[in-house]
């Protein structure tokens, strides 16, 4: 199940990339395409995401819930 999260001060959607099933952070606003490690993944001009595999452990630890609480990413990924 997708989850709305905060990463690097931006609201993104934690999900799995539709083509490969890889976990990623999907944009919620077209202005987010300039974020570090954001990649164009095809389709309409708004299909961009950050693949979690491209983030360091420190960067992954910065992904929080909307209320700022740290997430257990292993558990979150299991539930996706």
Where are these regions (language model features)?
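Acidic, low-complexity, intrinsically disordered interaction modules
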Residues: 14-66
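Detector for methionine-enriched segments
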Residues: 1, 35-38, 73
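Short intrinsically disordered terminal tails
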Residues: 1-2, 77-80
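Charged low-complexity stretches with an acidic bias
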Residues: 69-77
